[in-house]
Amino acid sequence: MVKLGFVIAEFNRDLTFMMEKLAEEHAAFLGADVSCKVMVPGSFDMPLAIKTLLQKDDIDAVVTIGCVIEGDTEHDEIVVQNAARKIADLSLEFGKPVALGIAGPGMTRMQAEDRIDYGKNAVEAAVKMVKRLKEIQ
């Protein structure tokens, strides 16, 4: 059984809550176990929590769940670009999958509501990567 850790952003919680629930349901459907959940203020705050989970022996992969909505400045782009870069770096550093389930940047609230399946898709990617990496090790 694949053991997942979830790192969930509290910012735009109404949306990340729906993303989280879909992700949990899909994990159960795939036979994966969500062993640990960590809530962080926002997507930019995820890397430290991800690193902590990746250090645990009982976590095979981490799924990120966040939603960054466009504002009047380029803040959303900076947040997502930096978070995504660090997330990829951590995956490579620890040799474990970290799936990007962050919706955004450059999206309106309405678009965000249409993209709540990003968490589900991240679970799918994480589980597939764990299984495929085990095949080649």
Swiss-Prot record:
GO biological process, one term: riboflavin biosynthetic process
Highest taxon of source: Archaea
UniProt keyword terms in alphabetical order: Riboflavin biosynthesis, Transferase
Active site annotation, chain numbering: 75 (proton donor)
Pathway membership, UniProt: Cofactor biosynthesis; riboflavin biosynthesis; riboflavin from 2-hydroxy-3-oxobutyl phosphate and 5-amino-6-(D-ribitylamino)uracil: step 1/2
Short name of any one Pfam family annotated for the protein: DMRL_synthase
GO molecular function ontology, one term from the record: 6,7-dimethyl-8-ribityllumazine synthase activity
GO CC annotation terms, alphabetical: riboflavin synthase complex
UniProt-annotated binding residues for (2S)-2-hydroxy-3-oxobutyl phosphate: 72-73, 115
Enzymatic reactions: (2S)-2-hydroxy-3-oxobutyl phosphate + 5-amino-6-(D-ribitylamino)uracil = 6,7-dimethyl-8-(1-D-ribityl)lumazine + phosphate + 2 H2O + H(+)
Residues at which 5-amino-6-(D-ribitylamino)uracil binds: 11, 43-45, 67-69, 100
Record text on subunit structure and interactions: Forms an icosahedral capsid composed of 60 subunits, arranged as a dodecamer of pentamers.
Job of this protein: Catalyzes the formation of 6,7-dimethyl-8-ribityllumazine by condensation of 5-amino-6-(D-ribitylamino)uracil with 3,4-dihydroxy-2-butanone 4-phosphate. This is the penultimate step in the biosynthesis of riboflavin.
Family membership: Belongs to the DMRL synthase family.
Protein name: 6,7-dimethyl-8-ribityllumazine synthase
UniProt organism field: Methanococcus maripaludis (strain C5 / ATCC BAA-1333)
Phylogenetic placement of the source organism: Archaea, Methanobacteriati, Methanobacteriota, Methanomada group, Methanococci
